[in-house]
Amino acid sequence: MSQLTHINSTGEAHMVDVSAKAETSREARAEAFVGMKPETLAMIIEGRHHKGDVFATARIAGIQAAKRTWELIPLCHPLLLTKVEVQLEAQTKYNRVRIESCCRLTGKTGVEMEALTAASVAALTIYDMCKAVQKDMVIGPVRLLEKIGGKLGHFKVEQ
């Protein structure tokens, strides 16, 4: 099993020193879901929400969150992201919204946390915008789908 990289020999948390690492191309994809009543989902799809376009707002929130992950998650490095994409899909069969994020850069550390943060904050934004209509929406699961690049190479979730 791998060692925890953010814990030093005395058990203290610290930010990993990546100064000696080579810059490589890295990408990560994550997903999140927001479950809701059919009426709430229909309101979003039909654009009837009094606060405006729920998907557009959630997309922008996810993008902004990815860019600020280092301010939200302790010990994360500030990264120069070259791509952040957030896609939202209404899944009427399951009464939910599926969010998929993709983050990319050329750098010394991975972008998994940025992708996970983008998907999570997009989901939280949907909840925030729709909570007046439905308070019992369910967020989750949230998970990493794929990681490309870095020392550990390629990871992809099995479907």
Swiss-Prot record:
Reaction it catalyzes: (8S)-3',8-cyclo-7,8-dihydroguanosine 5'-triphosphate = cyclic pyranopterin phosphate + diphosphate
Superkingdom as given in the UniProt entry: Bacteria
Residue numbers annotated as active site: 128
Listed InterPro entries: MoaC (IPR023045), MoaC_bact/euk (IPR047594), MoaC_sf (IPR036522), MoCo_biosynth_MoaA/MoaC (IPR050105), Mopterin_CF_biosynth-C_dom (IPR002820)
Keyword entries, A-Z: Lyase, Molybdenum cofactor biosynthesis
Keyword field contains Lyase: yes
Record-listed E.C. numbers: 4.6.1.17
An individual GO BP term: Mo-molybdopterin cofactor biosynthetic process
Ranges that cross the membrane: none
Metabolic or biological pathway: Cofactor biosynthesis; molybdopterin biosynthesis
Entry annotated with the keyword Lyase: yes
Protein family membership: Belongs to the MoaC family.
Subunit text: Homohexamer; trimer of dimers.
HAMAP family given in the database record: MoaC_B
Name of the protein in question: Cyclic pyranopterin monophosphate synthase
Organism listed in the record: Photorhabdus laumondii subsp. laumondii (strain DSM 15139 / CIP 105565 / TT01)
The gene coding this protein: moaC
